[in-house]
Amino acid sequence: MKKRILSILLVAALAAGTLFGCGSVKEETNETTKTIEEGAADAKTASNADSITNTEPVEITIAYPSDDGAEEKLNTLIEEFNKSYPNIKVNYELIPFSSWPDYITKLKTMVAGGTGPDVARLAVEGIQSFVADGMALPFDDFIAENADLMEELGVNDIHPNINAPFQIDGKTYGFAWDWNNIVMFLNKDVFAEKNIELPSADWDKDKFLEIAQALTYEKDGEKVYGTVAPTDYFTVTAWLYNNNASVLNEDMTKCTLNSPEAIETIQFLYDLVYKYGVAPSPSAGLDTSNLFMNGQIAMLGNGRWSIASLANNNFEDYDIQALPALSTRQSAFGSGSFPVLSSTKHPYEAMLFSSWLSASSFSQETFLKTDSVPSRISVMEKILPTMLPENGMLWRESADVAKSIQAPKQLTDVTAVFDKYMSLIFANEISVEDGMNKATEEIDAILAE
C-alpha cells in the first residue's frame, strides 16, 4: 500500500514519535480519553497556532480513499493546516477505493494489524460500525474544552441535521464535512428537443413516467432513454423513502424490504426497464454519466459529486430537481466526516486536525465548490447560488428535511445481500416479491447476529 510522508513543518527540527498503537483497540480507550483530558488542560482552546507552538512536535496519519485527485487535495489541505499548526506533522495513507463497504473492511484490517491511522475519512456508511467496535473516540471532552476553537473554525455553522449521523448515543464522533443526496439531473437539450418543460418541484410518479415516455425515442440510429433504473443501495433508498418505505425499520433491527410499499417501489423501478421501456437494462459496464452528457439519457438520479465530471467535460446544459414523489416527498442523504480512531497516541492533535478539516472555510470552500455539498450553512448559501446547476439551492433547502440513509454496524453484509437480490431481479432470475422476501430473511439473520 502506498504511503506518502509529508514534511510540511515550519519548525527547524522534529522529534520522532510512535505513530501507531498496538494491542486491543477497546483496551486503549480509557487511556486515550485520559490523554485528551491532559492535552485539553495544557492547551485550553488552541484557538490559534500560538497555543501549541511551544509543545513538542507530533506526527499523525490520516487514511483517505484513493479517488482521483486525493493526493493533490491532501497535500494542499495539510500545507494550509500547517500554516496555523506547524508542530503537527500530518502523513497520509491512500486506501484503494471501490465502495464504502470495501474501504471500511480495509481500514478495519489496518487497525486490527496495529497499523491503523489516527484520523480516517469515513462516511455515514461506516461510523456506526466503528463506534460499535470501539474504534472511534468521542469528541465531547475536546468540544467542551475548546469552545472558542469550535466557533473560530465554523463548527457551529455545520447544519445540525447533516451532522446528526455522527452523534451516536449522546456522543459526537466528529463533524460532517460534506454530504450528498440523490436528486434528478435533467438534460436540458433533450427536453428542449422534444419541447418539454423541466419538471416542477411538485411532480409525482405519474408526471415522471409521462415525461420519461415522451423522452424515450430513436435519434440517428441511437436509443435515447427517458431515465435510468437504479439498483444501488444509496439511490434505491432515496426512492424507497419517497414511498414511505425503507430497507430497515427505524432502529435498524429488522429488514422491511418485504413491506408492500418497498415491493411496490422496487417493482416500479423494474418496470421502468421491462414494462415501460424508458430505461436501459442495468449492467456493470453501463456508463450512465457519459450517456447523460451525450444526450442518450434525459433524466438521471445522482448526487452533487457528479458535477465535477460534468464541468471537466464542459457540459453545462443541465439542471436538477427533487426526485418525483411516489406516495410522499422525502430526501435521503449521506454525509462524511473525519473520525479519530481510538488507537491514536495523539488524540488531541488528531481531533484538532479533524475539526479543521471538517469545518474550516479553506477546506469547505476550496474543495467542496465542485464536489459534494458543503456541510456549513453559510458556505452552502455562498457557493450554491453562484454555480451550475441553476436550481442548486435545492441542496440547501433539502438539508433541512433530508433523512439519513440507514447504515447499521452490519452495513457491509446488508448491502451485499441487497446488491445480490437487486442483480437477480434485474437479470430476471427472480421476481421482485420473491427477491425482496428472500433479502428480508437474509438481512434479518445478519442483524440478529
PLM regions: where:
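Glycine-centered hinge/linker elements that transmit conformational signals in sensory
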Residues: 209-214, 251-282, 323
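Short, solvent-exposed loop/beta-turn-alpha elements that line the ligand-binding surface or hinge
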Residues: 140-158, 200-201, 218-221, 225-226, ...
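Short, low-complexity disordered leader/linker segments with a strong preference
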Residues: 1-61, 83, 382, 386-390, ...
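Conserved C-terminal helix/tail region of periplasmic/extracytoplasmic solute-binding proteins
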Residues: 42-46, 192, 198, 271-274, ...
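Long, aromatic- and glycine/proline-rich binding clefts that accommodate carbohydrate-like moieties
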Residues: 156-157, 368-420, 424
